[in-house]
Amino acid sequence: MSIVGLVSVVCPSGGIKKRYFSKGLDNFQGFRSSECLGIQLQVPVPFYSGIRQSPRATSLQVVCKDCPRPELEGAVNFLEAAQLSASFRSSPRPEKGLEVVVVGAGLAGLSTAKYLADAGHKPILLESRDVLGGKIAAWKDKDGDWYETGLHIFFGAYPNVQNLFGELGINDRLQWKEHSMIFAMPNKPGEFSRFDFPEVLPAPLNGIWAILRNNEMLTWPEKVRFAIGLLPAMVGGQAYVEAQDGLTVTEWMRRQGVPDRVNDEVFIAMSKALNFINPDELSMQCILIALNRFLQEKHGSKMAFLDGNPPERLCMPIVDHIQSLGGRAQLNSRLQKIELNPDGTVKHFVLGNGNIITGDAYVVAAPVDILKLLLPQEWREIPYFQKLDKLVGVPVINVHIWFDRKLKNTYDHLLFTRSPLLSVYADMSVTCKEYYDPNRSMLELVFAPAEEWISRSDSEIIERTMKELAKLFPDEIAADQSKAKILKYHVVKTPRSVYKTIPDCEPCRPLQRSPIEGFYLAGDYTNQKYLASMEGAVLSGKLCAQSIVQDYELLVRRSKKASTAEMTVV
């Protein structure tokens, strides 16, 4: 599930727009994607190597009512992910580690650098902004409160992410919630319907039981027709799933004779949570992959929240690990240009400040929209890069609202709103240790689909959000704030987030190894089985690192050849 964002709105001067609620004041700007991509943020902190976590970031003392960590280690996908991780640590140590320049310190870039370091190489990680994380970045406001690019959920069906936490020794930073999916009931304001997965049953029986036990959202005839519609996917396996890439969710359901109410009751919410778009746009392959992971693994749909802000609680431990093995991470280092050799390979990277960075190999782990802006003209006619035109980031808005009181009609869990404009939300003052507050609620909400709203003012977005919240909290929230009052809010706009998983995108997703010798890609849009998600980003980084390790001899010869050519020129 891709409940994440990418880029916060930035000022024309390059700073981040921080939003505070103030009556009569709303002069913050919304930007189109072309106005956001590639802007360099000017922050005078050149390296992360001199920064260490504060004691507060290391030990969070608040005790929350979380569930025990599920037993994931026996799952086939977890074991496969663990084996891939181990292959880097056990690979033959190189005589001299490759210097690999990795652009982008989101999860894909961090993963690439981490596993290259595990294999004995020296990654140089470059991030254009002043903060680690990419789509999971977060910032602290003047009051010391954090606001994030998205609402980040860690599933049991994320084997590479779960292995990563274990490898870093930070499993305890995931706050596992009860194994349930909770949906708001639009026709019954203030009420919710649950799908509870019993711990005593194995998969897929626990999921089937959860569906059968819920009689508030689907009738028995609807459940039967939905099950019959899914039979081809169960029988046909992966080949069938891949063949559905050409259909939207809505088209597939009509072909299979699934009632429209199944779409209205379940798949609108699921589509928006997975890719921030509605079922009439989303590829059915995306839904089938998610259902397969959730139903075939006992703990696949079990959810966890990170216990604090992602840059400190997840990204910084990865950077510390990379640096401990000889790699380095550099912030405020925007890639300006990819300079080429006469043969079309990469000569070096030119940064926004004019500095030149050279390496034995080069990785771009930035979002696909940024990559397309950076592609040298000489590469644009190559089919591998031409196919990227089909991949476009989807807009999303993340909203944080601090209220003057503790809301009662909420759960210690992720909640699906089933609202036309809101996707999912959580009361972070309850679900997350670092954001815990016994007296006031902080709701974090994903506003999607956001295409029609991305350029609107913050006040318009907050006004519409409050109208939707009044339906979820009819006794506690009113659109005019006559009940709970807003203390402050932050609105984080992401014009281009994860790639839009529309039909026929799958053939356009590139392999991590490009046809350009020594040049590689990482990102959830690249070819890997988990689509647009945190899991997909981490796996793409591992596959990218694997390709580089496999190409070691070739890359060494290439570097020696380049050095010889330079000496000859001199």
From Swiss-Prot:
What's the Enzyme Commission number for this chain? Answer: 1.3.5.5
UniProt: substrate binding residues? R293, A532
Q: In which pathway does it act?
A: Carotenoid biosynthesis; lycopene biosynthesis
The UniProt catalytic activity note for this protein reads: 2 a plastoquinone + 15-cis-phytoene = 9,9',15-tri-cis-zeta-carotene + 2 a plastoquinol
Q: Name one GO molecular function term.
A: phytoene dehydrogenase activity
Q: Which InterPro entries match?
A: Amino_oxidase, FAD/NAD-bd_sf, Flavin_amine_oxidase, Phytoene_desaturase, Zeta_carotene_desat/Oxidored
Give the record's GO CC terms. chloroplast; chloroplast thylakoid; chromoplast; membrane
The UniProt entry lists the main location of this chain as plastid
Pfam families the UniProt entry points to: Amino_oxidase
Mode of membrane association = Peripheral membrane protein
Give the enzyme class.
oxidoreductase
Organism superkingdom: Eukaryota
The task this protein performs is described as: Converts phytoene into zeta-carotene via the intermediary of phytofluene by the symmetrical introduction of two double bonds at the C-11 and C-11' positions of phytoene with a concomitant isomerization of two neighboring double bonds at the C9 and C9' positions from trans to cis.
Instruction: State what protein this is by name.
Output: 15-cis-phytoene desaturase, chloroplastic/chromoplastic
Native source species: Narcissus pseudonarcissus
